[in-house]
């Protein structure tokens, strides 16, 4: 199933349309404790109209575990979810990765919608069909390829994001420009991510997503050209380990 990416100008309108166009008997929304407070209010009225059940997990990648996944399965089960239910993942990459995997495996697969709320999730984690959890001390060790029905991208969520997380996502956009073209690279280098124009950033995010979508369409399961999207991971992770404060998330 191919996912549809919506570059949204009106998050409530676009989410309402996506929910309406996706078969469902019940709606569940997965957040973490931060996005529940900072991001859920932007769509809360709409989700209330659909009698959505909220499932909240703890933030941070250290909680992207089998235990947390089981908590989500349990919440879906207790909430009466069926094969025809819909899960809306509202959060950063941890939420979209784990929520996508929960949806891909619960009842052998239910529909889900991703609403990424961090810049990195917008241009990377929420798009492309990779879902998963950490396991045995290894990142994304267990997972599945499963496309969201919709990925709804709106930079309105970035107004609460700190500088470190903005830079983390922007580094991924710089990588996309390096494997795309010189004009895109020049535009990205000259953009002020520390004082971003969110409307302009949204246009750039759309272009960055298009780079990833083009590659993923040719190699959905990462047997060949899709490995280009991992550009910088090998040396980047080592550099991060030795040069960054442990409180910072990754920049590659």
Regions found by a protein language model. Give the residues of each.
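Oxyanion-binding "anion nests"
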Residues: 196-242
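Short glycine/serine/threonine-rich phosphate/pyrophosphate-binding segments
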Residues: 94-100, 238
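ATP/NTP phosphate-donor binding region
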Residues: 1-86
């Amino acid at each position: 199933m191919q996912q549809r990416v919506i570059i949204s100008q009106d998050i409530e309108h676009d989410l309402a349309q996506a929910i309406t166009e996706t078969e469902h008997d019940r709606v569940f929304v997965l957040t973490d404790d931060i996005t529940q407070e900072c991001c859920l209010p932007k769509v809360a009225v709409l989700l209330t109209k659909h009698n959505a059940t909220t499932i909240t997990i703890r933030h941070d990648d250290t909680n992207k575990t089998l235990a947390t996944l089981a908590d989500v399965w349990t919440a879906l089960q207790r909430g009466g979810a069926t094969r025809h239910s819909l899960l809306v993942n509202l959060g950063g990459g941890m939420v979209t990765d784990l929520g996508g995997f929960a949806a891909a495996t619960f009842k052998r697969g239910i529909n889900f919608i991703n609403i990424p709320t961090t810049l990195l999730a917008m241009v990377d984690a929420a798009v492309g069909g990779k879902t998963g959890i950490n396991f045995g001390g290894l990142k994304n060790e267990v997972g599945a390829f499963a496309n969201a029905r919709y990925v709804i991208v709106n930079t309105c969520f970035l107004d609460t994001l700190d500088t470190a997380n903005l830079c983390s996502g922007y580094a991924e956009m710089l990588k996309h420009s390096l494997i795309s073209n010189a004009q895109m690279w020049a535009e990205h280098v000259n953009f002020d991510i520390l004082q971003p124009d969110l409307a302009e950033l949204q246009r750039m995010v759309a272009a960055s997503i298009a780079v990833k979508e083009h590659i993923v369409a040719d190699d959905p399961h990462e047997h060949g050209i899709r490995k280009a999207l991992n550009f910088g991971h090998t040396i980047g992770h080592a550099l991060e380990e030795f040069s960054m404060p442990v409180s910072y998330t990754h920049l590659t």
